[in-house]
Protein backbone atom coordinates (compact mmCIF):
# COMPACT_ATOMS: atom_id res chain seq x y z
CA UNK A 1 0.00 0.00 0.00
CA UNK A 2 1.39 3.39 -0.99
CA UNK A 3 1.56 6.15 1.53
CA UNK A 4 1.03 9.81 0.86
CA UNK A 5 4.28 11.71 0.71
CA UNK A 6 4.47 13.94 3.80
CA UNK A 7 4.25 17.64 3.14
CA UNK A 8 7.57 19.46 3.49
CA UNK A 9 7.96 21.66 6.54
CA UNK A 10 7.71 25.28 5.34
CA UNK A 11 10.86 27.36 5.68
CA UNK A 12 11.37 31.03 4.83
CA UNK A 13 12.94 32.13 1.59
CA UNK A 14 16.30 33.86 1.82
CA UNK A 15 16.24 36.86 4.12
CA UNK A 16 15.06 39.96 2.26
CA UNK A 17 15.47 43.08 4.43
CA UNK A 18 12.59 45.54 4.59
CA UNK A 19 9.75 43.15 3.78
CA UNK A 20 6.16 43.75 4.85
CA UNK A 21 3.11 41.55 5.32
CA UNK A 22 0.09 43.67 4.46
CA UNK A 23 -2.53 41.16 5.67
CA UNK A 24 -2.16 38.30 8.11
CA UNK A 25 -4.15 36.70 10.93
CA UNK A 26 -1.79 36.26 13.89
CA UNK A 27 -4.58 35.06 16.18
CA UNK A 28 -5.44 32.22 13.79
CA UNK A 29 -1.88 30.97 13.41
CA UNK A 30 -0.66 27.99 15.38
CA UNK A 31 2.04 29.71 17.42
CA UNK A 32 1.99 32.61 19.86
CA UNK A 33 2.08 36.08 18.33
CA UNK A 34 5.47 36.85 19.91
CA UNK A 35 7.01 33.77 18.28
CA UNK A 36 5.47 34.58 14.91
CA UNK A 37 6.66 38.18 15.02
CA UNK A 38 10.19 37.09 15.98
CA UNK A 39 10.38 34.56 13.13
CA UNK A 40 9.01 37.13 10.69
CA UNK A 41 11.68 39.60 11.77
CA UNK A 42 14.40 37.00 11.18
CA UNK A 43 13.07 36.61 7.61
CA UNK A 44 13.33 40.37 7.03
CA UNK A 45 9.76 41.45 7.83
CA UNK A 46 9.86 44.95 9.34
CA UNK A 47 6.12 45.50 9.70
CA UNK A 48 2.86 43.66 9.28
CA UNK A 49 -0.87 44.21 9.57
CA UNK A 50 -2.86 41.60 11.48
CA UNK A 51 -6.54 41.42 10.65
CA UNK A 52 -9.67 40.82 12.66
CA UNK A 53 -12.62 39.40 10.74
CA UNK A 54 -14.93 39.17 13.76
CA UNK A 55 -15.23 41.19 16.94
CA UNK A 56 -13.12 38.85 19.09
CA UNK A 57 -10.51 38.57 16.34
CA UNK A 58 -10.43 42.35 15.96
CA UNK A 59 -9.82 42.70 19.70
CA UNK A 60 -6.91 40.26 19.40
CA UNK A 61 -5.51 42.13 16.40
CA UNK A 62 -5.60 45.42 18.25
CA UNK A 63 -3.99 43.86 21.32
CA UNK A 64 -1.14 42.53 19.15
CA UNK A 65 -0.69 45.95 17.57
CA UNK A 66 -0.28 47.48 21.02
CA UNK A 67 2.10 44.71 22.12
CA UNK A 68 4.53 44.88 19.19
CA UNK A 69 5.73 48.11 17.53
CA UNK A 70 6.08 46.44 14.12
CA UNK A 71 2.48 45.17 14.16
CA UNK A 72 -0.58 47.16 13.06
CA UNK A 73 -4.24 46.15 13.15
CA UNK A 74 -7.22 46.09 10.81
CA UNK A 75 -10.67 45.74 12.37
CA UNK A 76 -14.03 44.78 10.84
CA UNK A 77 -16.60 42.02 10.52
CA UNK A 78 -16.02 39.58 7.65
CA UNK A 79 -18.75 39.65 4.98
CA UNK A 80 -19.81 36.08 5.69
CA UNK A 81 -20.29 36.97 9.37
CA UNK A 82 -22.14 40.28 9.16
CA UNK A 83 -25.04 38.80 11.10
CA UNK A 84 -22.78 39.59 14.07
CA UNK A 85 -22.77 43.31 13.23
CA UNK A 86 -25.39 44.38 15.77
CA UNK A 87 -25.48 47.78 17.49
CA UNK A 88 -23.10 46.72 20.25
CA UNK A 89 -20.60 45.37 17.72
CA UNK A 90 -20.88 48.54 15.67
CA UNK A 91 -20.20 50.71 18.71
CA UNK A 92 -17.13 48.70 19.70
CA UNK A 93 -15.79 48.64 16.14
CA UNK A 94 -16.05 52.43 15.94
CA UNK A 95 -13.91 52.63 19.08
CA UNK A 96 -11.35 50.16 17.72
CA UNK A 97 -11.15 51.85 14.33
CA UNK A 98 -10.40 55.16 16.07
CA UNK A 99 -7.41 53.62 17.85
CA UNK A 100 -4.12 54.89 16.30
CA UNK A 101 -2.81 51.31 16.10
CA UNK A 102 -5.72 50.38 13.82
CA UNK A 103 -4.66 51.38 10.31
CA UNK A 104 -7.45 49.87 8.23
CA UNK A 105 -11.11 48.89 8.26
CA UNK A 106 -11.14 45.28 7.22
CA UNK A 107 -11.57 42.79 6.23
CA UNK A 108 -14.92 43.73 4.80
CA UNK A 109 -16.40 43.16 1.36
CA UNK A 110 -18.58 40.67 -0.48
CA UNK A 111 -18.47 36.88 -0.66
CA UNK A 112 -21.00 34.94 -2.73
CA UNK A 113 -19.01 31.70 -2.65
CA UNK A 114 -20.31 30.67 0.78
CA UNK A 115 -23.92 31.69 0.23
CA UNK A 116 -25.92 28.45 0.29
CA UNK A 117 -22.86 26.46 1.39
CA UNK A 118 -22.65 27.73 4.95
CA UNK A 119 -25.68 28.13 7.19
CA UNK A 120 -24.08 31.11 8.92
CA UNK A 121 -23.13 32.99 5.76
CA UNK A 122 -25.06 36.23 5.42
CA UNK A 123 -27.09 36.85 2.23
CA UNK A 124 -25.73 39.30 -0.32
CA UNK A 125 -28.05 42.18 0.61
CA UNK A 126 -26.88 42.02 4.24
CA UNK A 127 -23.27 41.84 3.10
CA UNK A 128 -23.72 44.92 0.92
CA UNK A 129 -25.34 46.89 3.73
CA UNK A 130 -22.48 45.96 6.06
CA UNK A 131 -19.88 46.83 3.44
CA UNK A 132 -21.38 50.30 3.04
CA UNK A 133 -21.34 50.71 6.83
CA UNK A 134 -17.65 49.78 6.95
CA UNK A 135 -16.84 52.13 4.06
CA UNK A 136 -18.45 55.01 5.93
CA UNK A 137 -16.39 54.20 9.02
CA UNK A 138 -13.18 54.14 6.98
CA UNK A 139 -13.98 57.52 5.46
CA UNK A 140 -14.89 59.06 8.82
CA UNK A 141 -11.71 57.78 10.48
CA UNK A 142 -9.44 58.42 7.46
CA UNK A 143 -8.34 54.79 7.43
CA UNK A 144 -7.66 52.42 4.57
CA UNK A 145 -10.41 50.05 3.43
CA UNK A 146 -9.35 46.39 3.26
CA UNK A 147 -11.57 44.42 0.89
CA UNK A 148 -12.38 40.71 0.85
CA UNK A 149 -13.84 39.63 -2.49
CA UNK A 150 -14.83 36.11 -3.40
CA UNK A 151 -16.89 35.51 -6.51
CA UNK A 152 -18.43 38.99 -6.31
CA UNK A 153 -16.46 41.12 -8.78
CA UNK A 154 -19.34 42.97 -10.44
CA UNK A 155 -21.27 43.69 -7.25
CA UNK A 156 -18.13 44.79 -5.44
CA UNK A 157 -17.05 47.19 -8.18
CA UNK A 158 -20.58 48.61 -8.28
CA UNK A 159 -20.68 49.28 -4.54
CA UNK A 160 -17.20 50.77 -4.45
CA UNK A 161 -17.97 53.02 -7.42
CA UNK A 162 -20.97 54.71 -5.82
CA UNK A 163 -19.68 54.84 -2.22
CA UNK A 164 -17.48 57.57 -0.73
CA UNK A 165 -13.77 56.99 -1.34
CA UNK A 166 -11.56 56.21 1.68
CA UNK A 167 -7.89 57.16 1.87
CA UNK A 168 -7.01 53.88 0.11
CA UNK A 169 -8.84 50.78 -1.09
CA UNK A 170 -6.89 47.53 -0.84
CA UNK A 171 -8.13 44.42 -2.63
CA UNK A 172 -6.66 41.80 -0.33
CA UNK A 173 -5.56 38.41 -1.67
CA UNK A 174 -6.32 39.65 -5.17
CA UNK A 175 -7.62 36.69 -7.17
CA UNK A 176 -9.87 38.20 -9.84
CA UNK A 177 -9.53 38.13 -13.64
CA UNK A 178 -7.27 40.53 -15.50
CA UNK A 179 -10.11 42.80 -16.63
CA UNK A 180 -11.04 43.36 -12.97
CA UNK A 181 -7.40 44.09 -12.18
CA UNK A 182 -7.28 46.72 -14.92
CA UNK A 183 -10.52 48.34 -13.73
CA UNK A 184 -9.33 48.36 -10.12
CA UNK A 185 -5.97 49.84 -11.04
CA UNK A 186 -7.62 52.51 -13.19
CA UNK A 187 -9.64 53.50 -10.11
CA UNK A 188 -6.48 53.75 -8.02
CA UNK A 189 -7.09 50.68 -5.88
CA UNK A 190 -4.16 48.72 -4.45
CA UNK A 191 -3.79 45.04 -5.34
CA UNK A 192 -2.41 42.91 -2.51
CA UNK A 193 -0.97 39.60 -3.69
CA UNK A 194 -0.91 36.52 -1.47
CA UNK A 195 0.65 33.08 -1.86
CA UNK A 196 -1.71 32.08 -4.66
CA UNK A 197 0.25 34.35 -7.03
CA UNK A 198 2.98 31.69 -6.84
CA UNK A 199 0.70 28.85 -7.98
CA UNK A 200 1.71 27.51 -11.38
CA UNK A 201 -1.73 27.98 -12.99
CA UNK A 202 -2.10 31.61 -11.88
CA UNK A 203 -0.20 33.29 -14.69
CA UNK A 204 -2.98 35.88 -14.94
CA UNK A 205 -2.30 37.00 -11.36
CA UNK A 206 1.37 37.42 -12.16
CA UNK A 207 0.38 39.48 -15.18
CA UNK A 208 -1.75 41.68 -12.91
CA UNK A 209 1.27 42.14 -10.64
CA UNK A 210 3.33 43.11 -13.67
CA UNK A 211 0.77 45.66 -14.90
CA UNK A 212 0.22 47.44 -11.60
CA UNK A 213 1.84 50.88 -11.36
CA UNK A 214 4.30 51.64 -8.59
CA UNK A 215 2.37 52.38 -5.43
CA UNK A 216 -0.51 50.03 -6.25
CA UNK A 217 1.02 46.73 -5.16
CA UNK A 218 1.25 45.10 -1.75
CA UNK A 219 2.21 41.57 -0.71
CA UNK A 220 0.65 39.53 2.07
CA UNK A 221 0.53 36.06 3.55
CA UNK A 222 -3.14 35.91 4.60
CA UNK A 223 -1.70 33.44 7.12
CA UNK A 224 -2.48 30.81 8.18
CA UNK A 225 -4.05 30.43 4.72
CA UNK A 226 -2.72 30.79 1.15
CA UNK A 227 0.68 29.23 1.74
CA UNK A 228 2.94 29.93 -1.25
CA UNK A 229 4.75 27.37 -3.36
CA UNK A 230 6.71 25.22 -2.73
CA UNK A 231 4.79 24.68 0.52
CA UNK A 232 1.22 24.94 -0.75
CA UNK A 233 -1.16 23.04 1.52
CA UNK A 234 0.93 23.54 4.65
CA UNK A 235 0.22 26.08 7.36
CA UNK A 236 1.24 29.63 6.50
CA UNK A 237 2.80 32.33 8.67
CA UNK A 238 4.33 35.81 8.13
CA UNK A 239 7.91 34.50 7.93
CA UNK A 240 7.03 32.84 4.60
CA UNK A 241 6.23 36.13 2.83
CA UNK A 242 9.60 36.01 1.06
CA UNK A 243 8.38 33.31 -1.33
CA UNK A 244 5.58 35.59 -2.51
CA UNK A 245 7.99 38.52 -2.66
CA UNK A 246 10.35 36.62 -4.95
CA UNK A 247 7.49 35.73 -7.31
CA UNK A 248 6.05 39.25 -7.46
CA UNK A 249 9.52 40.78 -7.86
CA UNK A 250 10.19 38.54 -10.85
CA UNK A 251 6.83 39.43 -12.39
CA UNK A 252 7.58 43.14 -11.99
CA UNK A 253 11.16 42.90 -13.25
CA UNK A 254 12.60 44.00 -9.91
CA UNK A 255 15.15 42.62 -7.53
CA UNK A 256 13.65 41.32 -4.28
CA UNK A 257 15.25 44.24 -2.47
CA UNK A 258 13.69 46.73 -4.89
CA UNK A 259 10.28 45.13 -4.43
CA UNK A 260 10.67 45.25 -0.65
CA UNK A 261 11.42 48.97 -0.86
CA UNK A 262 8.41 49.56 -3.13
CA UNK A 263 5.85 47.64 -1.06
CA UNK A 264 7.18 49.07 2.19
CA UNK A 265 6.60 52.60 0.89
CA UNK A 266 3.10 51.62 -0.25
CA UNK A 267 2.37 50.04 3.14
CA UNK A 268 3.36 53.28 4.87
CA UNK A 269 1.29 55.42 2.52
CA UNK A 270 -1.96 53.45 2.51
CA UNK A 271 -1.84 52.69 6.22
CA UNK A 272 -1.05 56.30 7.13
CA UNK A 273 2.43 55.66 8.49
CA UNK A 274 4.40 57.74 5.98
Q: Residue locations for each model-derived region?
A:
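Mid-domain alpha/beta scaffold segments of enzyme catalytic cores
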Residues: 1-274
Amino acid sequence: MSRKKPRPIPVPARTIPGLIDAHTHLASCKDDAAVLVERAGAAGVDKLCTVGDGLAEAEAALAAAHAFPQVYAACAIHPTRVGELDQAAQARLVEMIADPRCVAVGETGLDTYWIGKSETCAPLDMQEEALRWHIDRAVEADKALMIHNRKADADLLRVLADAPAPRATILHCFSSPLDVAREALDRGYVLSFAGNVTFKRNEELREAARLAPTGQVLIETDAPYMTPEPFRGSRNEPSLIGHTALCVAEARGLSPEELAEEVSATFDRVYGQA
